[in-house]
Every structure is written in C-alpha cells, then in structure tokens.
C-alpha cells in the first residue's frame, strides 16, 4: 500500500506534465489575431466596387438579388415563423476567387484541390506605383517562396460616380510570370481586378487570352487561383507569420465565387 501511495504523486506529476505539453502544442496553433478580408454582401455590392459604368461596359446589367421568402406555421401552440431565401449573386462582385474557365483556360472551381485555398501569406505594399501594369518583378525577387500566397495592397478606391471608370495598379506581365513559374499557391489583390486596360501588354503572341488579359493568363493557365476585391489588406502590412485561408463554395464548373477570406496571424 505504501508503494502505491508513493507512486500516486509521480503519476500525477507525469500526467500534469503531459497535459501542459499538449496545451502548449494547442496554443501554438491558435493565432494571435484573425483578420477578415471579406465584407458584408449586399444587393448593390458589385456596383460599389466596380462602379455602374464598368458593370455596363462589360454587359452586366444587374447586381445581386435577395429573394427572401417568409413563412409561418401554426402547430396548435402558437405561430412558428421563419424564412428561407434565394440569393442571386454576381460572382465577381465582392471578394472572390477566379477559376481557369473565367478566361476559358480550363476547368471551374471544382478542379482546384482544397489545398489551393490555403497557404503561408506574403503581402506587398505597391501603392507607390502608378496605375496600370506597373508592379515589377524586383518587388518579389528573393522574397517569395514556392507555395506562398502572394497578395498586393494597391490602395484601390472604388469609382466615386457612375461615369468614373475604375483605376487600378496591377502586376507587369514579367512579374506575373515570375510568380506563376515559382509557382505561388495563389495571387491576391485589393483592386477590383488584375485586368487592366491602361496600357498595352508587353508580350507578342497569337493567343487572344494572353494578349487581352496577360495577368489572368499567367496564373489561370497554370491553375493558380486569383483573389480580387479583398478588403482590409492594409491591416496586414508590416505583419509576419501569416496563414491565408480562402475556400469558396465548390460550384460545378463555376468560373468564380465570392469568398470570405481570413488571415491567421501567428
């Protein structure tokens, strides 16, 4: 009996030590901060981000539509009320991810493995560059590893009137090719698109998709997701040890879908 009594504190000490180690391991998985790169989806969100002029130019005559159906049932002890809804969403009007078939470059969202939507994040402030395809390769050279999610902060400001076209900063074709060839896991921006009409692409090709949308082509032709219209990217500047998570609804043949991306800061 004395031996058992003597050993009991030893077992308790070992058990508590193991518990502390497990707690320590769990704590290393809990982020210090979680930053939401999404926004509240409203019926007019696409117009807020694109501006009506740009929506009309591309032939998008409507934004989002919320059809809420309220219902009530009497089960004998009072009315039970609630609602269901049909949500018609413009899938590129808000924080979203592009799939290859957005530019006729392959399959839809369902071809992406789930691993494509998560990865270590590197954020770059490119607000000092002028509008257009102006962000050069040197911004990323030797600062990005294969498998990283690369995000740029452009300081995008939505059009302030219906007749004002959106202006944006995006990558040069050389920079998009550099990142895509590493390859990065995904590319992201706060601007409404990586597409730009401010200047001519610095590439010669017979491929219409490459000539028209070279930045999209670099990534989507290699099945690398593109995230656009992200919010709160400025809150990520100067932070390190970040993990990006941005999985969309897995829509069959979907060319894109709205996302609520999260960044976990460790």
Language-model regions, residue ranges each:
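Sec-dependent N-terminal signal peptides
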Residues: 6-10
